[in-house]
Structures are given as C-alpha cells and as structure tokens.
C-alpha cells in the first residue's frame, strides 16, 4: 500500500508542490487535480485538507505523513511526530493593536484564531486577559471595538498595515513542517524513509 | 436521553469480543502463575499526581469529596497497583489485573485494559517474562502480525548527563525527543554543548529500527560502558523475542519516558494492520520509592479495546430454536439441555425461525408433550 500524505490546501499546497517538484517528484497529477481531494501518484496517495484536519488525519493514522503550518501544531498540539521544518510557509506570531491607540489600563481584550497560543503567551508574561475566539479576519476586532488587540500570524505585515494595526510584539517564528503518524513511522519505516530523506536533502540544498 | 462526549453504549460483537479477550487473558494468566489483583475504581487524586507518579490532574475525571479532597476515577492501573502491592508479602511476584481506566486525553473517556505487574524479580527474568506473556497472549488471540518495540530511559539520561541542563531545559529536550523534532533537539543541545554532542543526541531521533540499529550502536557506544550495557541488554531481550518466533522486533533508542516513573526498559506493541498500540509498559522501580521501598518492578498493559476490535471470532455453534408455549415451557427447558454445545433459544412463535439452523416445536398429543423438527 502506498504511503498517504495529507497536504494542507491553499498556500502551503502551492509552496509544497514547488518544493516537491524540486526533489524530482512528478507533481503533474497534483497540479491538475481539479477539485479532487484525493489524488494517487506513482509513489503516494495524497489527500488535501485544511491544516487542522491534516493533523487529525495524521494523528489517527489515516495519513502517514502530513505537511502543515507550525502555527496549527503549536495551537492544537496533536499527538504526532513533528519531524522537521520545511523551507517554505515562513511566518511569525504577533501581538498587534490599532495604530496610535494606547493599551487600556485594565484587563486587555485580545481577539485571535489562536486562543491556546494567546493564552500561553500571556500566561508566560503573568498577565490575565480576556480572549475572544474568532475564525477569520481577526484584524476587524480592534477596528469594530470587540478587542483592544489581536494575536495572529503575520507574513509580510501588509494586511495589518492596511487595516490600521501595528505590531507591538513578535514572539514565535514558524514554517511549514513535516509530521508523521507515530505508528506509521515505525511500521512503514522502509516505505517512508525514501521520501523523508528526500525532504531532508531538500532542506540541505536550501 | 443523551450520553456525554466520549461515552457510548455497546452491543453485540464489540461486547462479545471484549469478553473473549478478557477470558483468554485470564486463562493465560492462570497458566503462567499470575495472581489476580483488583483496586477500587475511585481513588485519591494524589495517588496519581504526586511527584513519583507524575500524572496530569487535568486529564482525570475528578470531584471533591465531603472533606474537600479530590477523588478521581482510576486513570492508571500501574500506580494504583503499586499502592496496593506495598502491603503484600514480597513472596508474591506476579500479578495480573483487568478493568477500565478513565482519562480525558484518550479517545473515549473509558478504556479497558488487562495487564501484568512483576515485582521482586531479577531484571532480565521480569522483563523477559513480561514480553513473553505478551507474545503468548497475542498468540492465543490469533494475532500474528505485530511489531514489538524496545526502548530504554537510560540512553537519554546518559547522553544528557554531561550537558548540565536545568529541569526546564531537560523537559523541553525530552519533549522534543518525544516528538522526534530534530531541529529543536539540535538547537537545545547545541546551545549547551559542542556541535559533535548536539549531532550525537540529534541522531537519536532517527535511531530506530531492527537488529541493524542495535549492531550499529553496539559499535558506536563501545567506549561508553553504561550505553554499551543498555544496548546489550536490549539486544538480549530482542534475541529472546526472535527465538520465541516474534517476526518483527525493533528498538527506538531515541524513545523517552512519558511518565516520570519509568526507569529502564520500555516496551510497546503495535498491530501492523492498523498501527494501533496494543500494549505498552516497562520498568518502573522508581514508583515504589514513594513508599520508601527499593523494589524491582516491571509490567505492561494491553489495550483490550484495540485487541477486541482486531479479534475475528468464528462462531462454530449450531443455532437451535425450540417453539413452545407457556404450558410447555418447562418441557422445552428440559429439552434445551439435551443439546450440548449449541446455542438454544426458546420462543413462543416461529417468526424468527430464519435466524436458526434447526427449529423444533413442542406439541401436545394424548396429554403428552413431544417434539417435532420443523
């Protein structure tokens, strides 16, 4: 049975395919997959899912390997082998607030998709905050008055800037990572070794 | 009426398989001279959260009793049995148990286990007996396609001893090793030691495999007496298993303990078909230090839910239905006992007769009951 790789849809997918092609793998069926969420190549079965679902599929052994952003791993802490970083998907976690506005004197209100990371960040600082969980467009929260600031991932900072926000602290640096199911790595060691070695060669080349 | 998340009703084959797995386990235990032990399902939280046991209270099902103490549903057998065994006479060496554990960090709140604990026994004898008990039990369950993996807590301890890491750094490094997160392992060690030492410890992330890995590290560690002793010990256990017909034995030299009480060899069994962990365990002499006892202790626990899911029980009984009525029920019951080694059911109608191999009907003739096959 071919190893199964779960791949995060969207930007990570595009960057991974470029990286995968640079390792001399045929990515043609993956590029021209249309709306298919499951694509079989000569060597692997690929499944395409949202980042957090990639970790779920890998944790439960549906997929042997996964390609996922480290922000997802830090937030959800899945029980998987978190093998190594990949040379793409770089971003950082930042605390931001509205430009020109001061933080309130009392308890700060923070909006984020990453409530666990936010909670841990302020815990490390010894500060109690109110955290609001949002699913997207977190930049809106300070503008509309839901929160005093946000914790979110930042790549270029353009979205923050365009919405009138400024970064006040950067505290985690992320990239995409290769994860593995804990049993698969042992049981399918020989089948997975080749692709894992190829990924690592790709890192060295970088 | 609804059930809480993680709880479920179970019927039919699932329950049959689990009962069968427990039955076979008990039979194997009797024949291998284990004595049964059971501990209460409700315990004080401190039994499991103290510094020796080191379990996380957040993952337990807990409440305050009337005295304000925290009580929990048993989250782990080994710790509970250690508490119970310190009161037992040391001449009793081999113990077996079966029952549920309750934790929030696993799929489903309740999971069923069966396991063994061996105390006051020489190291190799205890560990060998644990592993060979696992081999026999899996054989009795007709499970042949599995992998047994060995590890040892002493490898991490020996390699990190010269680094003089703080407790926090040591925990971070152990966590990174547990996740095989090579970049973090390298970064932590490289900040405290030479690049060569960082490379050596990072290499442990990939040091898993079969006898080839054992032989490679026998050579690499030839000048370190402690590591050489460990690798030779693991080789002896692996050889014992292969001599007993286990096809797939491997080591993971980078495996670290996930509970503070492990202190030596660690075991894990995987079912190759699904990748599920079917047993795990190891040496935990340290657990007894909380009772000021110096005891050799080793054991393992089987995940009965995983094993039961994997069981394929062939039902070989003939299914017989006896159709009777209230007045002839006693006669039908008498008749039931004439069919030995068959599943026999008494019903008052024949509407389910398709579910049976043979159907008999009790009829009355001349004031006497007789039976007619349909």
Residue ranges and their predicted role:
Chain B
Residues 20-28, 44, 78-89, 95-143, ...:
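Positively charged, Gly/Ser-enriched RNA/tRNA-binding surfaces
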Residues 36-39, 95-97, 147-151, 250-252:
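A structural signal for short, well-ordered beta-strand segments and their strand-loop junctions
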Residues 62-73, 175-176, 279-282, 367-374:
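Short, basic, helix/turn surface patches
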């Amino acid at each position: 049975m071919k190893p199964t790789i779960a791949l995060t849809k969207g930007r990570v997918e595009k960057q991974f395919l470029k990286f995968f092609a640079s390792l001399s793998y045929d990515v043609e069926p993956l590029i021209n997959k249309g709306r298919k969420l499951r694509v079989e190549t000569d060597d692997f079965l690929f499944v395409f899912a949202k980042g957090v679902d990639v970790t779920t599929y890998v944790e439960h052994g549906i997929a042997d390997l996964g390609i996922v952003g480290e922000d997802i791993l830090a937030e959800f802490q899945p029980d998987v082998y978190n093998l190594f970083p990949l040379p793409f998907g770089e971003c950082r976690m930042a605390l931001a607030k509205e430009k020109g506005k001061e933080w309130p004197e009392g308890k700060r209100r923070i909006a984020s998709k990453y409530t666990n990371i936010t909670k841990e960040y302020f815990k490390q600082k010894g500060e109690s905050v109110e955290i609001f969980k949002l699913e997207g467009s977190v930049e809106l929260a300070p503008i509309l008055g839901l929160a005093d600031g946000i914790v979110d991932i930042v790549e270029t900072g353009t979205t923050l800037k365009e919405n009138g926000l400024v970064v006040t602290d950067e505290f985690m640096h992320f990239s995409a990572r290769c994860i593995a199911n804990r049993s698969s790595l042992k049981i399918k060691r020989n089948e997975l070794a080749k692709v894992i070695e190829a990924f690592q060669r790709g890192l060295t080349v970088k | 009426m609804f059930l809480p998340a993680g709880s479920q009703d179970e019927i039919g084959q699932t329950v049959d398989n689990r009962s069968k797995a427990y039955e076979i386990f008990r039979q194997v235990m009797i024949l291998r001279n284990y004595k049964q032990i059971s501990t209460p399902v409700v315990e004080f939280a401190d039994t499991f959260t103290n510094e020796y046991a080191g379990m996380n209270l957040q993952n337990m099902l807990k409440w305050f009793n009337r005295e304000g103490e925290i009580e929990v549903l048993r989250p782990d057998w080994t710790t509970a049995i250690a508490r119970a065994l310190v009161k037992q006479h040391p001449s009793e060496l081999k113990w077996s148990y079966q029952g549920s554990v309750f934790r929030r960090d696993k799929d489903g709140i309740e999971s069923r286990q069966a396991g063994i604990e061996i105390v006051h026994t020489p190291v190799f004898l205890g560990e060998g007996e644990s592993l060979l008990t696992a081999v026999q039990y899996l054989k009795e369950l007709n499970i042949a396609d599995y992998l047994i993996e060995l590890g040892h807590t002493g490898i991490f301890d020996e390699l990190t001893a010269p680094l003089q890491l703080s407790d926090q750094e040591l925990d971070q490094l152990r966590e990174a090793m547990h996740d095989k997160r090579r970049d973090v392992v390298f970064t932590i060690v490289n900040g405290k030691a030479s690049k060569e030492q960082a490379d050596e410890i990072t290499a442990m992330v990939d040091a898993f495999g079969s006898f080839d890995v054992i032989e490679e590290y026998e050579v690499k560690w030839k000048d370190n007496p402690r590591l050489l002793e460990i690798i030779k010990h693991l080789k002896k256990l692996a050889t014992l298993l292969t001599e007993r017909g286990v096809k797939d034995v491997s080591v993971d030299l980078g495996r670290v303990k996930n509970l503070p009480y492990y202190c030596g060899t660690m075991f894990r069994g995987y079912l190759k078909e699904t990748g599920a962990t079917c047993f795990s365990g190891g040496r935990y002499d340290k657990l007894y230090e909380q009772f000021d006892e110096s005891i050799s202790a080793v054991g393992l626990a089987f995940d009965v839910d995983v094993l039961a899911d994997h069981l394929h029980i062939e039902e070989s009984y003939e299914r017989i239905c006896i159709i009777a009525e209230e007045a002839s029920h006693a006669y039908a019951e008498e008749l039931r006992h004439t069919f030995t080694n068959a599943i026999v059911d008494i019903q008052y109608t024949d509407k389910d007769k398709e579910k049976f191999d043979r159907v008999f009907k009790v009829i009355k003739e001349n004031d006497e009951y007789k039976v007619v096959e349909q």
